UniProtKB/Swiss-Prot annotation, chain B:
It comes from Prochlorococcus marinus (strain MIT 9313). Keywords: ATP synthesis, CF(0), Hydrogen ion transport, Ion transport, Lipid-binding, Membrane, Thylakoid, Transmembrane, Transmembrane helix, Transport. F(1)F(0) ATP synthase produces ATP from ADP in the presence of a proton or sodium gradient. F-type ATPases consist of two structural domains, F(1) containing the extramembraneous catalytic core and F(0) containing the membrane proton channel, linked together by a central stalk and a peripheral stalk. During catalysis, ATP synthesis in the catalytic domain of F(1) is coupled via a rotary mechanism of the central stalk subunits to proton translocation. Key component of the F(0) channel; it plays a direct role in translocation across the membrane. A homomeric c-ring of between 10-14 subunits forms the central stalk rotor element with the F(1) delta and epsilon subunits. It is found in: Cellular thylakoid membrane. GO terms for cellular component: plasma membrane-derived thylakoid membrane; proton-transporting ATP synthase complex; proton-transporting two-sector ATPase complex, proton-transporting domain. It comes from the Bacteria. The gene is atpE. This is ATP synthase subunit c.
Length: 241, 82
């Protein structure tokens, strides 16, 4: 099926339509790359501006960045534990900030003003490829965390506390990235769909509270993704006695 | 896509979200009830309880979202469209 039959120019929603870029044998979704590069650029600019001319008493952007740093450190420390959290804080922080900026950037920036030949610009996290990539990164990260910290003793975790747990723990390794990616993808796409359907039914005022709800849930989803990534890493580096 | 496949896909998409919303709905009700009870007993812990509640809400909600993902696949990227 093609795009939904929406008549309003700014409420069009094209699910499953993409702007394809051909690179070698690969077909990539160009609109996702464009938005994510823009948002990554904005994030980098914010950090560069905030860390230039640092002062003892933080003000403005530096203050915001220090608040974020504190927030991410607390998140990582409660999930991973005092010993290992320092190594993983950059990873968790990057995940959190990228997902948060993607979700909000997709909702707050008026992308509809830029017209593409096919597909539409929007949150990079509303594309399943982005979220699967992030989730697989988390899988790699927790395997690496466990193996580098404990060596082959990492596999004790699979038979802890009893060997009966072995099949469940192996299945878990596959369900973790699956649920991580689907949760994020589904939530962000659902927010966009709900707003689009409401705008189609009642174009004025009524969609606004739903948009705020969407902003709220997408912030929570960024927090959940980061928290779960930290929790999985913490589970892998935890010592059993 | 022939009409039987279309009809079956649309019905299945509706059922996927509708049935998938039952369990999380009950779960969220129980969780919210527990949180209200906790706040009533210990009003000073409200901030902490609210944070945990929202986080667990999002987990429950994602179960319905899995149903929604199935529904969206059936509607927009149907593998049986042929």
């Amino acid at each position: 099926m093609g795009p939904l039959p929406f008549a309003l120019p700014f409420a069009e929603l094209e699910v499953g339509q993409h702007l394809y870029w051909q690179i070698g044998n690969l077909k990539i979704h160009g609109q996702v790359f464009m938005t994510s590069w823009l948002l990554i650029g904005a994030l980098l600019a914010l950090v560069v501006v905030g860390t230039r001319k640092m002062e003892r008493d933080p003000r403005g952007v530096q203050n915001l960045l220090e608040f974020l740093w504190d927030y991410i450190r607390d998140l990582a420390r409660t999930q991973i534990g005092e010993k290992a959290y320092r190594d993983w804080m950059p990873f968790i922080g990057t995940l959190f900030l990228f997902i948060f900026v993607s979700n909000w950037g997709g909702a707050l920036v008026p992308w509809k003003l830029i017209h593409l030949p096919s597909g539409e610009l929007g949150a990079p996290t509303a594309d399943i490829n982005t979220t699967v990539a992030l989730a697989l990164l988390v899988s790699l990260a927790y395997f690496y965390a466990g193996l580098s910290r404990k060596g082959f003793r990492y596999f004790e975790y699979y038979v802890y506390p009893t060997p009966i747990m072995l099949p469940f723990k192996i299945v878990e390794d596959f369900t973790k990235p699956l649920s991580l990616s689907f949760r994020l993808f589904g939530n962000i796409l659902a927010d966009e769909l709900v707003v689009a359907v409401l705008v189609f039914l009642v174009p004025l005022i009524l969609p606004v509270p739903v948009m705020f709800l969407g902003l709220f849930t997408s912030a929570i989803q960024a927090l959940i993704f980061a928290t779960l990534a930290a929790y999985y890493i913490g589970e892998a580096v935890e010592e059993h006695h | 896509m022939d009409s039987i496949t279309t009809a079956a896909s649309v019905v299945a998409a509706g059922l996927a979200v509708g049935l998938g919303a039952i369990g999380p709905g009950i779960g969220q009700g129980t969780a919210a009830g527990g949180a209200v009870e906790g706040i009533a007993r210990q009003p000073e812990a409200e901030g902490k309880i609210r944070g945990t509640l929202l986080l667990s809400f999002a987990f429950m909600e994602s179960l319905t979202i899995y149903g929604l993902v199935v529904a969206l696949v059936l509607l927009f990227a149907n593998p049986f469209a042929g």
